[in-house]
């Protein structure tokens, strides 16, 4: 989930309800500043795609507005930003670099997974085949970014609920691949990826990107 102006909202993942829940969040944001900021790549994927539907699909837009009975129909006006996009585009990685008090000073691999990058047209987050935004953040925080082939492949996602063995194979393959390219640590922007990749047999630590921010900016222990 996520908060907007102190109000707890949820992306509501089930297929039938996720669009209506996301539309309500988008409409709320429209009337309270016009931007919706997400921390979770799964939430971001759902909300960004629903927003695209509300802009471009007359049928979806009409049905959603009729059901929600908004005072003013919602048509995709809200700008949806992932927190990392906000750091890059609104704060600036150069500005963040100037605030670093404890450079990370280690080799870190970015793990994008699926949901931040695909479908690329709707997400428009970064190049789906060769993303760089998280590597740029790592560098700004004083770390050495490590690129490796499996950084934008699937971690196993919700398969872990029914087939832990298959997810374990994905986890170990990704960790082994990252380690073979020199990564000492992995960083992700997806809670599910974090869950699936932790405790790998390769001993490659996996953290959320906010943990690196807190460490580099000197607020980790506060």
Language-model-derived ranges and their functions:
Residues 1-222:
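Iron-sulfur cluster-binding electron-transfer modules in prokaryotic oxidoreductases
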